[in-house]
């Protein structure tokens, strides 16, 4: 039976899990790690790198290394905030103001969905190898506060990666599935999910297989990246003050600062202070410049105080919408690596009045919950009822640029609701339906999801025609809207695919390209692996002949050195056939040397102290 996997497509890291033997299990990637950096890079030779290997080369290739892409997915450029400040790569827009990521190495612009699709593809390929069968179906998580465009864009990313996305599930809800899977007694839990790029708070009733979301709130412009940025800005300011040089204008330096800031943030979760040392961060006519700074936890908390304070608002909103007080919360579940920050844990404890539950791994809990939901859809998990909600209100634009809500936020999904509207002028032949998402009173302040037109309305005085507008949200939280003239029976519908996501034709084209390039990508990956293996063999062989210099002849040493030099040259020239050939030769030579040294050592050990040889085959009479 085909496996359905659960995927936490994160801003910083991604995780994939599956139900095995009735238990959710995290699948390690090809490198043996349980989390995969959500990083994609393209080298000057146009090789594609994904995950840890892409992250490692980011400093040397900042303009072609794409990270934290989740912060751009499903958004237009005017919806972005500080996200643009911390990117070492160039963020552009197309003619429709959709976000595009520039890749100089390929002379190409990517949609964020395409980059996310590469991360998904790696996760799925590694999972397929681990499970011994092809994975084609998945449940993918999104922040609870993602709007319709962002959800649809995430689904598109899955499709581009060759996946049938069975369900889009909210991250806090997935976390609750993981936490409450074996809970029999009813509990009211607050899920505090602070990830790399987004922040969600959900309140749920959990118990005996029923998971009901009471409310959700959040901030899609707040995450661990913002805490890193505070340290980066401080380092730039301090270095400018000390040296008179603005490191923020140097992409390579900015990438090094970002990595150092993330490392310092993580260290300050367990240490009172840490040092940031970046030698040769830049240079001037007087020579190289080094950055050396000490940062204390108190200083870090001072720099990030406004971010910490922002975490309070969604918590209060979620409690208010659920009509609960902090005293009604039985457990607090922390999700996301950023919840390891001590100041965040202290804030949660102060607001709710109890210590957070530490029984779940904040990095893996969402993927594990997604695997449970995948198990439900595959029929492997029984007796689970999940009642999720829509995070933001949905409605249409009415006369005067006002948003009229049809579905209120925190309504349980799937759901279907309708309202009757009419014409604004006499003999109006058509109406334009402008679909909106948000909580503000006026159209201009809310997110536009799309427009469509209903034609063929019978001539009549204004206010007479009856136009029924029906909103239908599916279990993925994705919206369809239908308008119907009750007089003529004519109707028009639209599935909201997100105003800032890729058109359907473009998605289909990218899916086809991905399928066509699958073998090419696999071949390129094999070539990279071959070069890495060959490089490792050169290193090991060099070490061995240095260690065994007294035990092997000069001719053997020269032969090995000649093969090592030839192999290194072949690696530089990307001559893969030659790499294979020389690699095999070098392996054989090193194996023979190993046998020879081992045999010689055995003979030495079998000699007596006076130099005579013991006949090990002789028997005493």
Curated annotation (Swiss-Prot):
Subcellular location: Plastid, Chloroplast
Keywords annotated in UniProt: ATP-binding, Chaperone, Chloroplast, Nucleotide-binding, Plastid
GO terms, molecular function: ATP binding; ATP-dependent protein folding chaperone; unfolded protein binding
Entry-linked CDD domains: ASKHA_NBD_HSP70_DnaK-like
One Gene Ontology term, aspect cellular component: chloroplast
Chain spans, region Disordered: 597-621
InterPro entries (alphabetical): ATPase_NBD, Chaperone_DnaK, Heat_shock_70_CS, HSP70_C_sf, HSP70_peptide-bd_sf, Hsp_70_fam
Alphabetical list of PROSITE patterns matching this protein: HSP70_1 (PS00297), HSP70_2 (PS00329), HSP70_3 (PS01036)
Coiled-coil annotated spans: none
Domain of life: Eukaryota
Record function comment: Acts as a chaperone.
HAMAP family xref list: DnaK
NCBIfam families named among the record's database cross-references: PRK00290.1 (NF001413), prok_dnaK (TIGR02350)
Family affiliation: Belongs to the heat shock protein 70 family.
UniProt-recorded name of the protein: Chaperone protein dnaK
Organism: Gracilaria tenuistipitata var. liui
């Amino acid at each position: 039976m085909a496996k359905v996997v659960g995927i936490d497509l994160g801003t910083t890291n991604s995780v994939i899990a599956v139900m095995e033997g009735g238990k959710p299990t995290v699948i390690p990637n090809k490198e043996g790690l349980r989390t995969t950096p959500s990083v994609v890079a393209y080298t000057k030779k146009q090789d594609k790198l994904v995950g840890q290997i892409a992250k490692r080369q980011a400093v040397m290739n900042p303009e072609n290394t794409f990270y934290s892409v989740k912060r751009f997915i499903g958004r237009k450029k005017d919806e972005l905030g500080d996200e643009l400040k911390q990117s070492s790569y160039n963020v552009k827009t197309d003619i429709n103001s959709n976000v595009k990521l520039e890749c100089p190495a390929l002379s190409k612009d990517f949609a964020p969905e395409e980059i996310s699709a590469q991360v998904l593809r790696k996760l799925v390929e590694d999972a397929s190898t681990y499970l011994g069968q092809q994975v084609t179906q998945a449940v993918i998580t999104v922040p609870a506060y993602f709007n319709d465009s962002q959800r649809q864009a995430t689904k598109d990313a899955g499709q581009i990666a060759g996946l049938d996305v069975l369900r889009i599930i909210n991250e806090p809800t997935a976390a609750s599935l993981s936490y409450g899977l074996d809970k029999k007694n009813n509990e009211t839990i607050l899920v505090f999910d602070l990830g790399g790029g987004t922040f969600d708070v959900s309140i749920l009733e959990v118990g005996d297989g029923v998971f009901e979301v009471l409310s959700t709130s959040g901030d899609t412009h707040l995450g661990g990246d913002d805490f890193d940025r505070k340290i980066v800005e401080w380092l730039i300011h301090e270095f400018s003050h000390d040296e008179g040089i603005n490191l923020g204008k140097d992409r390579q330096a900015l990438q090094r600062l970002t990595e150092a800031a993330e490392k310092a943030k993580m260290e300050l979760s367990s240490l009172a202070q840490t040092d940031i040392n970046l030698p040769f961060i830049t240079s001037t006519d007087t020579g190289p410049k080094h950055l050396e700074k000490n940062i204390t936890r108190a200083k870090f908390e001072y720099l990030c105080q406004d971010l910490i304070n922002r975490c309070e608002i969604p918590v209060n909103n979620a409690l208010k919408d659920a009509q609960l007080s902090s005293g009604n919360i039985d457990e607090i579940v922390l999700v996301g690596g950023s919840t390891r920050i001590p100041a965040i844990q202290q804030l949660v404890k102060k607001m709710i009045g109890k210590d957070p539950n530490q029984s779940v791994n904040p990095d893996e809990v969402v993927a594990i919950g997604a695997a449970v939901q995948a198990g439900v859809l595959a029929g492997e998990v029984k007796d689970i009822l999940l009642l999720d909600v829509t995070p933001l209100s949905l409605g249409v634009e009415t006369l005067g640029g006002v948003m009229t809500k049809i579905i209120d936020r925190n309504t349980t999904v799937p759901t279907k609701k309708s309202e009757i509207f009419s014409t604004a002028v006499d003999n109006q032949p058509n109406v334009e339906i402008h679909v909106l998402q948000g909580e503000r009173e006026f159209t201009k302040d809310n997110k536009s999801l799309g427009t469509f037109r209903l034609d063929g309305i019978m001539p009549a005085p204004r206010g007479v025609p009856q136009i029924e507008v029906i909103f239908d949200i599916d279990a993925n939280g994705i919206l369809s809207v239908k308008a119907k003239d009750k007089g003529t029976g004519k109707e028009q519908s639209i599935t909201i695919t997100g105003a800032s996501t890729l058109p359907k034709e473009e998605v289909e084209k990218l899916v086809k390209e991905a399928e066509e390039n699958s073998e090419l990508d696999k071949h390129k990956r094999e070539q990279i692996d071959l070069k890495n293996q060959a490089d490792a063999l050169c290193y090991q062989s060099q070490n061995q002949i240095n260690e065994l210099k007294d035990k092997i002849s000069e001719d053997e040493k020269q032969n090995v050195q000649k093969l090592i030099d030839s192999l290194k040259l072949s690696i530089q020239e990307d001559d893969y056939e030659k790499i294979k050939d020389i690699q095999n030769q070098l392996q054989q030579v090193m194996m023979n040397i190993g046998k020879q040294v081992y045999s010689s050592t055995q003979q030495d050990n079998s000699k007596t102290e006076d130099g005579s040889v013991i006949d090990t085959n002789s028997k005493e009479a």
